[in-house]
Design a protein with these regions (language model features):
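Long, hydrophobic alpha-helical segments that serve as membrane-spanning/inserting helices
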Residues: 1-186
Length: 186
């Protein structure tokens, strides 16, 4: 029993780290989009360091998958039924639901971003300039002035109002489950 729950705890920690990474990526994307929008008509005034930091994020994507092997093992074996404290069993199930929700939340951001950016990069003008020997500043300046590029940056900046708040809530619930496992089985 203790060994199985230690596996669950390890898996919850892995998923928590992933959720934290999703939060960071979404926040950086939002910050970058806001930065580019701020310098829409004056890209020459934007910091080169900031452009190098933020400029590539709109065109990159990263997918995450939840890790649920330990939970599947609990369900397939009799371990879940043998957990004496039923509140803990329920909390573990809820923690995995939270993990799923976090991934769906990130996926919502990711798909909205992807759709908006695709409308921009599919424009013939964008394809033409991105194949020329232009600096990142020139490409971003051109991109943000395209109606589709401007719309993409606005979409990225508005997808979720406060991702930090939502992801932090998810991580807090996972932390509470980990603490509960430690309290019961350590």
């Amino acid at each position: 029993m203790t060994q199985a729950l230690q596996l669950v705890k390890s898996e919850l920690l892995i998923n928590r780290e992933t959720i934290e990474e999703m939060m960071k990526i979404e926040k950086i994307n939002k910050e970058g989009a806001c930065y580019l929008l701020q310098y829409k008509d004056k890209m020459n005034e934007a910091s080169s360091d900031s452009l190098n930091y933020y400029g590539y994020f709109p065109f990159q994507s990263q997918d995450f998958l939840p890790v649920t092997d330990a939970m599947e093992m609990l369900r397939a074996s009799s371990v879940m039924q043998n957990i004496k404290n039923k509140e803990l069993a329920v909390e573990i199930i809820q923690a995995y639901a939270v993990i799923k929700n976090a991934h769906l939340f990130y996926e919502g951001f990711s798909k909205a971003k992807e759709t908006a950016v695709e409308k921009c990069v599919s424009q013939q003008e964008f394809r033409k300039i991105s194949n020329e020997n232009k600096s990142l500043r020139e490409i971003l300046e051109f991109t943000i002035l395209l109606p589709e590029g401007f719309a993409a940056m606005r979409q990225i900046s508005f997808v979720h109002d406060d991702p930090h708040l939502t992801y932090s809530h998810y991580m807090k619930l996972i932390d509470e489950t980990i603490t509960f496992i430690d309290k019961e089985y350590n």
